[in-house]
UniProtKB/Swiss-Prot annotation:
Annotated source species: Listeria monocytogenes serotype 4a (strain HCC23)
Cofactor: Mg(2+)
Lineage of origin: Bacteria, Bacillati, Bacillota, Bacilli, Bacillales
Residues binding ATP: 33-40
Name this protein carries in UniProt: ATP-dependent helicase/nuclease subunit A
Keywords of the record: ATP-binding, DNA damage, DNA repair, DNA-binding, Exonuclease, Helicase, Hydrolase, Isomerase, Nuclease, Nucleotide-binding
Length: 1235
């Protein structure tokens, strides 16, 4: 059919393929858009052109535009709006354009989940749900799910004679718990939801175990997987033998081996003529392979030792390959493999029914709570859009409404989403209106059950001329990256990707072509940095082994030093906004990694090089000391009878006990809970430790009561305040980060309380489940990712982004194979597979289905990882740097040389399929580059024609592991110092340190004066010292602490504490009437009940002195003018330094703070009254003598009070009085005199 593409204007900047994508119509369109090909711009332009064409009679609300993320949807809507406004600016009278601008906010431009939500909100009655439902977050959904699942299992256990269920439990769980069954049901539920009809998929899962009518394994639906695997491995064995024969044929090669090797090869080649219709024939053919003993070389000196060893090594590899085929596929008889599946069928049937029950119960529970989760949206939308297996009336209405449906990132859709899109698009193939954009090479979300085969099927059936089921348009030109980056990517992936292994051919249509030209330079050549670890043992290492940790450290230091070198050398970067080169900045650099396990090492390495660093890490939050301590404390508040959390809290800075003290507590009660021992120790011991424990127990009881009365956030904040733990961690190294983590804990508790769950117990349980499942939350961020920092993120997080310089790290980290080697495997095509467990004999056998699906999942994982690597390499705009460690470069390069003689561009299938890490692919690909040939001086390397610029640098770990050398040097220096000998090395910072030591600060006088002082402190500086004075003038607005310092607790109250108690009572006494003794005693009882005053403080208060005050002229005045009285008035006041210190001549001001006990504020004047508890009677000869001392002591204080209050209020301080409780003396202070 004709594409009806209008001619491209000569002035157009669009490529021919981009123009086709913008203009194509009349059929479904698939745009295969390579990385950096401008797909978003094409998509937006297509939409805008359609909308501004008034002859098309298209409104924006007649388009459905689906994006992958909310951010993408917002950006899409913004770009369309901007385009419409520009068009309206050129044609301001257009009613059509005005209408489009007005309709834009009502247009369906969103994620598919949001579109489904829109359908449900509008047609809720079709799905039979409450329209007032609330959409919940995954956290709340998981908590409801766990409750429902536990309830279901408990119900099943309670059913009498439920033999099928009990057999299932015995078959799939351990002896101690049913956690495995719990997890299996949950996994199956999630997996089934990726299918349009989950129940149908679960039922089909059971049918794969129906083998009654099957007589041979070759009849099983998944036999093609088995055949493919055997063929691949036989071919690999053949290649091993061919390599061995090549070495035997070399000059000085082990020629006597040739006859044996050729006989081996004949046997292997004969397997290519196998009868694949008979499993018995296959088994016999494989088992009959006979590798004869290789002959002994008589004169070994006549042969090259390397050739001899290589020939032996390759033959042994071939023997091992054939042995593995026999072990994996033919270890049991055919009849046993088939009978195992039949025996498992009842368990699988029970499991299927159990998952269906759970799904129904889970949905019912959410309905009762009036909530839905994200997984419900797609399936409820499907329920509304489907009528049986046909489009419902609602779906038909959408088909009429949407004149075109456009979907971005189509390669990441699943079967449910595909069905929804099909139901709202035109069902006629001849008039298809679905426009899909994506790149299957960037499909990296299989773990989210994305289905890249949907894209591939259309890619293979759609034709570029539109003659097939739709139109296919390839956008291969890359406008993001320099030629150096594209050449490197193409060179590697031409050798890696084909339909067999990667599910797509990397042909001329798929490879990247240069779109934006820039001058070539060697500085932009792709770099491969290999760090030779020499002694590493890759046979036994895992991701958390000491070897792997050391690899992370070395790699991190390599990268940090490389970044420091680029920054210091002002590496030139082309700035697209400035349209010119500029020196590189930290923000230009990103470090990409498959996982973030090396982030802490990377951060440490960056600190050493003084490089600002931001790691987008979603783990490590619960492991931080401050968060772990708070979680432990909350567990103890919830239930103190938990030994480990209790010990953690006691040992933490909150309580501060040491190991010896913890041991003493346990000795108080050797058996039972540690909390009982704690209580026993408190009661039988008199010590400082016992006092600490007593205080803690009282505080713990208060928190436990608070946890019942108040919400969770109130409890957490109260703990922060009472323990000062938040302030404490702020003073530790990394204090800002630690405080951010504690704030995040408060925020997350607040979010939790907004769910349908409440309370401390549930929150603690929720956190425990997150920890068990490994669902960490990620530490709080104190540095924004948009700042001038080097960023580190996962490759998945980088998808859709671009960076001037990309450093890909962790290339030698092993692929995550946990899912493949899991006890149970799930597959979209074949359902569920696991080992067969004979519960009577307690023997476990691998099933043929399990082996087949394991191979299938392994191939899918390899294809996915290949696409992940493609995404990583295509993020770079200017420069690509690849960093990896190798256990032994000499041995590793020899392994790569095995494929160096290959003449085909594509690497052998087995080499690609058996890769364990990215470096296996990159090494085997780049070994055929001329740069490697020059490095290794190996003539046997068959280099491939390429324009890729590659710089290879081999480093050793000793270049980076300097700590040991530095420690040895420091030990030598220490010996020199002990012997009074000079240190042989002079610090390079000597001159800089000298400058610091000799520096004189110009405003030194200001450093001796505090920027903020209390009036009390000033009074001390300018007046006589008196231990009986009340010096607590700066009062805090918080609950009075009942805890006295430990060294004072056994003594009577100090004069200061007595004064504080008197002031507290004076603040609380009512001025409505003259108080009596009974009034004051009742008030004190109330204050004790509210924990405002302690028993000791009440006992120390002299009630008679309080009563005497109200008999004095000042007291009577306060009672008469009660409405004008203000008590405990705080103030802050800036005062010039020169007014405080006569001999200091600097232009600075000091912040003065204080609290006025009482003041009578009239219309124009203020009277100040300050209470004093100084000892007067019996200490001075008479009041005249005392008054002179008191005026001198308190003159500064009252003068500052008066000046501050007068300045703040704007009213004159008419009088200022001191009232002394001891002796009922009144002293008036002249506030006009100088300081």
């Amino acid at each position: 059919m004709s594409l009806n593409i209008p001619p491209k204007p000569e002035e157009s900047l669009w490529t021919d393929d981009q123009w086709k994508a913008i203009q194509a119509k009349g059929n479904n369109v698939l745009v295969a858009a390579a990385a950096g090909s401008g797909k978003t711009a094409v998509l937006v332009t297509r939409i805008i052109k359609k909308l501004i064409d008034e002859s098309a009679n298209l409104n924006v609300d007649e388009l459905l535009i689906v994006t992958f993320t909310n951010a993408s949807a917002a950006e899409m809507k913004f770009r369309i709006g901007k385009g419409l406004e520009e068009a309206l600016g050129q044609n301001p009278d257009s009613a059509h354009l005005k209408r489009q601008v007005a309709l834009l906010n009502y247009a369906s431009i969103s994620t598919l989940h949001s579109f489904c939500l829109e359908i449900i909100r509008k047609y809720y009655f079709e799905a039979d749900i409450d329209p007032s439902f609330r959409l919940i977050e995954p956290i709340e959904s998981s908590m409801i799910r766990d409750e429902v699942l536990e309830g279901l299992l408990e119900q099943e256990y309670g059913i009498e004679n439920n033999e099928a269920f009990f057999h299932l439990v015995e078959s799939f769980t351990g002896d101690r718990s049913d956690a495995e069954l719990h997890s299996l049901i949950s996994k199956l539920y999630d997996f089934s939801r990726a299918n349009p009809d989950p129940n149908a998929w679960l039922e089909a899962m059971v049918n794969f175990y129906n083998t009654e009518e099957i007589t041979s394994i070759t009849e099983l639906p998944y036999f093609p997987i088995i055949k493919e695997d055997i063929e691949l491995r036989v071919n690999q064995a053949k290649n091993y033998l061919l390599n061995a024969i090549d070495y035997a044929n070399e000059n000085n090669g082990p020629a006597p081996y040739l006859a044996t090797l050729e006989n081996d090869l004949v046997q292997i080649q004969a397997l290519s003529e196998l009868n694949w219709s008979s499993w018995t024939h296959l088994k016999t053919s494989i088992e009959n392979i006979d590798f004869k003993r290789i002959p002994t070389l008589k004169n070994k000196s006549d042969y090259d030792e390397v050739y001899v060893e290589e020939a032996k090594k390759f033959r042994d590899a071939a023997k091992k390959e054939m042995k593995n085929i026999a072990t994996d596929w033919f270890s049991r008889e055919e009849v046993n493999y088939l009978s195992d599946l039949e025996k498992m069928k009842p368990d699988i049937q029970t499991l299927s029914e159990l998952v269906k029950k759970f799904a129904a119960n889970f949905f019912e529970e959410k309905q009762q709570r009036g909530v839905l989760d994200f997984n419900d949206l797609e399936h409820l939308a499907l329920k509304i859009l489907l009528n049986g297996d046909k489009a419902s009336e609602v779906a038909q209405n959408y088909q009429k409404q949407f004149k075109e449906v456009l979907i971005d990132e189509y390669q990441d859709t699943n079967m449910v989403q595909e069905t929804i899109l099909r139901l709202v698009t035109n069902p006629s193939e001849a008039q298809g209106n679905l426009f899909m954009v994506g790149d299957v090479k960037q499909s990296i979300y299989r773990f989210r059950l994305a289905e890249p085969t949907l894209f591939m099927t259309k890619y293979q059936t759609f034709q570029q001329d539109g003659s097939g089921n739709g139109i296919r348009i390839d956008l291969s030109q890359n406008f993001r990256s320099r030629k150096e980056v594209l050449d490197a990517t193409n060179f590697i992936f031409r050798q890696l990707m084909d339909k067999h292994i990667a599910e797509i051919d990397y042909d001329t249509a798929a490879e990247l072509t240069l779109g934006a030209k820039s001058p070539e330079t060697n500085a932009m050549a792709t770099e491969l940095l290999l760090i030779d670890m020499k002694t590493e043992d890759t046979e036994t290492e895992d991701e958390l082994s000491p070897q792997e940790l050391q690899k992370n450290q070395v790699e991190s230091r390599t990268i940090a030093m490389k970044i420091r070198e680029m920054i210091d050398n002002k590496f030139p970067i082309y700035d697209k906004k400035l349209k010119q080169n500029r020196p590189i900045q930290y923000r230009d650099i990103v470090i990409l990694s498959r996982a973030m396990t090396s982030a802490p090492d990377m951060e440490e390495a960056m600190k050493v090089q003084d490089i600002p660093f931001y790691a987008n890490n979603n783990s490590g939050y619960f492991e931080t000391t401050e968060v772990a301590t708070m979680i432990a404390l909350m567990k103890v508040v919830d239930n103190p009878y938990q030994d480990i959390p209790l010990a953690a809290v006691l040992r933490s800075p909150i309580i501060g006990l040491n190991e010896e003290e913890l041991g003493q507590i346990r000795m108080a009660k050797k058996k039972g809970y540690f909390y009982d021992a704690l209580l026993a120790y408190k009661d039988i011991t008199v010590s400082e430790t016992a006092d600490k424990i007593s205080d803690f127990v009282q505080q713990l009881n208060n928190w436990r009561e608070l946890s019942i009365r108040e919400n969770l956030t109130s409890l957490i904040w109260q703990i922060y305040q009472e323990t000062n733990f938040y302030e404490f961690v702020g003073g530790l190294p990394g204090g800002k980060q630690r405080q951010a983590n504690l704030r995040a804990l408060y925020d997350r508790a607040n979010q939790y309380e907004k769910t349908s769950f409440r309370g401390l117990f549930r929150f603690v349980r929720f956190v425990e489940r997150l920890e068990i499942r490994g669902d960490d939350l990620g530490t709080a961020k104190t540095l924004g990712e948009k700042e001038d920092v080097v960023r580190m993120m996962t490759i998945h997080a980088s998808k859709g982004l671009e960076f001037p310089v990309v450093i890909v790290s962790g290339l030698s980290r092993k692929f995550n194979m946990r899912d493949i080697y899991s006890k149970t495997l799930l597959d979209k095509d074949y359902g569920f597979a696991s080992s067969y467990r004979d519960v009577e004999k307690m023997i476990v056998y691998p099933t043929i289905m399990q082996q087949a699906i394991k191979q299938k999942k392994s191939r899918e994982m390899i294809a996915e990882e290949m696409r992940v690597l493609y995404v990583a390499l295509t993020r770079a705009e200017e420069k690509l740097i690849l960093v990896a460690t190798v256990p032994d470069f000499e041995k590793t390069s020899k392994n790569w040389l095995q494929v160096a003689k290959e003449k085909e561009t594509i690497l052998p299938a087995a080499t690609r399929a058996k890769a364990k890490c990215y470096l296996d692919w990159i090494g085997n690909a780049t070994i055929r580059h001329s740069a490697f040939k020059e490095l290794l001086c190996e003539e046997m390397i068959q280099t491939l024609a390429t324009e890729m610029k590659l710089q290879i640098e081999i480093k050793t770990k000793e270049m980076f592991l300097t700590n040991e050398l530095e420690r040895a040097e420091s030990d030598n220096w220490l010996e020199n110092i002990k012997e009074h000998q000079p240190v042989p090395i002079q610090s390079p910072y000597k001159d800089e340190i000298q400058r610091y030591m000799e520096y004189e600060y110009q405003n030194e006088a200001a450093t001796e004066i505090r920027a903020k002082q209390s009036v009390t402190e000033l009074k001390r500086q300018f007046s006589l010292q008196d231990n009986w004075s009340d010096t607590t003038l700066l009062k805090e607005f918080q609950k009075v602490s009942l805890d006295r310092p430990k060294f004072l607790q056994k003594n009577k109250l100090s004069a200061t504490e007595i004064g504080t108690a008197m002031h507290t009572l004076m603040q609380a006494v009512s001025l409505d009437y003259k108080p009596t003794k009974e009034d004051l005693e009742q008030l004190l009882r109330t204050m004790r009940e509210k924990d405002i005053l302690t028993d000791a403080q009440i006992k120390a208060i002299n009630i008679k002195q309080i009563l005497d005050f109200f008999e004095s002229p000042l007291g009577e005045t306060m009672l008469q003018k009660k409405d004008l009285v203000k008590r405990e008035v705080p103030f802050s006041y800036l005062l010039p330094v020169s007014e405080l210190y006569e001999n200091v001549d600097i232009d600075e001001r000091v912040l003065i703070q204080g609290v006025v006990d009482s003041m009578i504020e009239e219309e124009e004047t203020i009277t100040l009254i300050d209470y004093k508890t100084d000892k007067i009677e019996g200490r001075y000869a008479d009041w005249n003598a005392a008054e002179k001392v008191m005026k001198e002591r308190y003159h500064i204080q009252i003068k500052l009070y008066a000046e501050a209050i007068q300045a703040i209020s704007g009213k004159k301080v008419a009088a200022a009085y001191l009232y002394f409780f001891d002796g009922q003396h009144i002293c008036q202070i002249n506030t006009k005199e100088g300081l």
